[in-house]
Amino acid sequence: MKTRVAVISIIIRDKNEVEKINEMLHEASDYIIGRMGIPYRQKNINLISVAVDAPEGVISALSGGIGQLPGVTVKTAYSDVITETP
């Protein structure tokens, strides 16, 4: 199986979606290298950056699923680091 390193950047404008996002990230926890959350109180938004090493399909599904939530914006940056695992 080929895995790829990527960073998923999430901007949350609707705080009601935070619990759903955390559930989705928990489901993908086997692939998460690390994450950082920053509350930006002056703008009333939250920023989350998630580093992953996963198959492209998993990254795409996670990013797409989170991006479907109302009040949430997602962008994913893929590295050229691809690893073949048995």
Annotated model-derived regions:
Residues 1-86:
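Long, contiguous binding/interaction regions
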